[in-house]
């Protein structure tokens, strides 16, 4: 059985993007020192309307990676289930960079008329063993969506 992940969406001035993925290992990750290179993150975004988006002519050529592609991991740390750093947490939190020109991390998409929400599915693979104080965590895949939490700007 594959693992469960949770996402955190931050609302930036250029729109809402998934900035963190929390991987639930279900056991203590104390002593783990994971690196971004130990993970690959693939995302597939699909229309909630059930059909492909019309790409308007005024926007130029349609990018190939607008709905399916990979995300870069910039940082990884041991955390609790909310994504807060925690020395004896049971999760690892992956931080993902978010940029205005990289729409693959967004939870919205321009449909030709308006920005609309899209379905987002991640497939996160731990590619190498991670040592902890208790044992070693073998490579595994996380593709079961456990839910999303939105963080709005603080005023």
How would you describe each model-predicted region?
Residues 1-155:
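Non-catalytic beta-sheet/beta-sandwich ligand-binding modules that flank or precede catalytic cores
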């Amino acid at each position: 059985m594959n693992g469960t992940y949770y996402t955190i969406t931050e609302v930036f001035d250029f729109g809402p993007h998934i900035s963190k993925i929390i991987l639930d290992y279900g056991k203590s990750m104390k002593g783990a020192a994971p690196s971004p290179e130990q993970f690959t993150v693939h995302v597939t975004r699909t229309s909630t309307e059930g059909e492909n988006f019309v790409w308007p002519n005024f926007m130029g050529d349609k990018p190939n990676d607008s709905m399916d592609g990979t995300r870069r991991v910039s940082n990884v740390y041991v955390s609790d289930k909310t994504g807060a750093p925690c020395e004896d947490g049971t999760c690892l939190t992956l931080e993902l960079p978010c940029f205005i020109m990289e729409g693959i991390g967004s939870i919205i998409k321009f449909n030709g008329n308006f920005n609309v929400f899209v379905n987002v599915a991640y497939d996160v693979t731990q590619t190498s063993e991670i040592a902890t104080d208790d044992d070693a965590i073998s490579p595994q895949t996380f593709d079961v969506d456990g839910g999303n939490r939105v963080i709005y700007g603080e005023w």
